[in-house]
Swiss-Prot record:
Transmembrane segments: none annotated. Gene3D superfamilies: 2.30.30.30, Nucleic acid-binding proteins (2.40.50.140). Keywords: Cytoplasm, Elongation factor, Protein biosynthesis. Pathway: Protein biosynthesis; polypeptide chain elongation. Its main location: cytoplasm. This is Elongation factor P. GO terms for cellular component: cytoplasm. It comes from Rhodopseudomonas palustris (strain BisB5). HAMAP family: EF_P. GO terms for molecular function: translation elongation factor activity. It comes from the Bacteria.
């Protein structure tokens, strides 16, 4: 489907010269003189090459049709990440380029949304929050309840984050999968 360049947003998938590109960032620039343009940073899905394009805001570009479906994460091996569609039990393999920074948060049997173009996965959406265990941090310091300072910690998936002073090793915490930031102590 053809759309004007100014309507392209991060996460959209474009089709150019028979190849698919996922939009990393899109910015509309309105100079004082001259024609407004859309500056678009994209990554080619087939090989991960980053491309920067500049279009007039009124130019037409081809937006690929994408279908979002729930998949269950099975396992990771040297070839990539393997997911299963729960209703048909069809398995799909997703490359490391598509999974990107989401890889540490993937847990066995986790339900994620895969954006599919035909039979190719082009993007992954994790649940907003993940519950993980703190495996390394400074010892709990008594009497530091008034300050809002955070201390560094390493979680069970290897991600570094900052936690409040009262959180110790072995504590289960809830973090945002988008950036790994601490939300709260787990209630389990």
């Amino acid at each position: 489907m053809r759309v004007i360049a100014s309507s392209i947003r991060k996460g959209n998938v474009l089709e150019q010269d028979g190849k698919l590109y996922v939009v990393l960032s899109a910015e509309n620039i309105h100079p004082g003189k001259g024609t407004p343009v859309s500056q678009i940073e994209m990554r080619r899905i087939s090989d991960g090459v980053k491309v920067s394009e500049r279009y007039k805001t009124t130019d037409q570009v081809e937006k690929a049709t994408i279908e979002e479906r729930n998949y269950t994460f099975l396992y990771e091996d040297g070839e990539g990440f393997h997911f299963m569609e729960p209703e048909s039990f069809d398995q799909v393999q997703v490359t490391k380029d598509v999974v990107g920074n989401s890889a540490p948060y993937l847990a066995e049997n986790m339900v994620v949304k895969l954006s599919m173009h035909d039979t190719t996965a082009v993007a992954i959406t994790l649940p907003q929050r993940a519950t993980l265990e703190v495996v390394e941090t400074e010892p709990v310091t008594k009497g530091q309840t008034a300050s809002s300072s955070y201390k560094p910690a390493i979680l069970s998936n290897g991600v570094r984050t900052a936690v409040p002073p009262h959180v110790g090793v072995g504590t289960r915490v809830v973090v945002l999968t988008e950036d790994g930031s601490y939300v709260e102590r787990a209630k389990d």
